[in-house]
A protein has these predicted regions:
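Amphipathic alpha-helical interaction segments
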Residues: 21, 25-30, 54, 58
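Negatively charged
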Residues: 49-171
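Glycine-/proline-rich flexible loop or hinge segments
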Residues: 1-4, 25-33
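Active-site recognition of the HExxH zinc-binding catalytic motif
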Residues: 9-27
Length: 171
């Protein structure tokens, strides 16, 4: 966070990481079926739509990063991943600006983009148990945060996030 000079950048990055937790991107058991960098970009496209008025750091991936790809708002990680995968395979002709942006991102060092190689359920039995315990604790914390939030503020939470929280509470 040292390189994030403004409070707005810091808040945006913390919100970004919290949203990855809320959407449970790091607990995906199928994560090994995806190309890691494309998965990360698709996950960032999902969460960065919910940052609001906070300023993401320069170079953050948003829908505007891929101007001629026809990305729609509020789609799933899988939907964005599929679009990015197609772009990577044959996008130079159909979406040249987006293809150039993706090539640039794919060439960046992991440290700059964030290393999510540890995401996904570990293959060992102990790792799986630890992952389940961590996810259960995360669920508890999300529900507790919702319960501590005065009802008058619930309307300020985006509908998609409210739905995720409602599903957690029901389960």
């Amino acid at each position: 966070l040292k390189e994030l000079r403004s409070q707005s950048n810091r808040v945006a990055v913390i919100k970004h990481e919290a949203l990855h937790l809320l959407f449970k991107h790091l607990f995906r058991t199928d994560i090994k079926n995806y190309e890691p960098t494309l998965f990360n970009i698709a996950a960032d496209l999902v969460v960065n739509q919910f940052i609001g008025s906070w300023k993401l750091p320069e170079g953050a991936v948003t829908l505007n990063t891929f101007p001629d790809l026809g990305l729609e708002q509020n789609q799933t990680l899988e939907w964005y991943y599929e679009k990015l995968s197609k772009l990577q395979n044959n996008g130079e002709n159909t979406a040249p600006k987006s293809s150039e942006a993706l090539s640039k991102i794919m060439g960046e060092k992991e440290q700059k983009r964030g290393d999510h190689s540890k995401w996904g359920t570990p293959p060992t039995a102990k790792g799986q148990i630890d992952g389940i315990a961590a996810e259960t604790e995360l669920d508890r914390m999300i529900i507790q945060a919702r319960e501590r939030t005065p009802a008058k503020y619930w309307g300020t939470i985006p509908g998609e996030i409210n739905t995720l929280i409602d599903i957690l509470i029901e389960n």
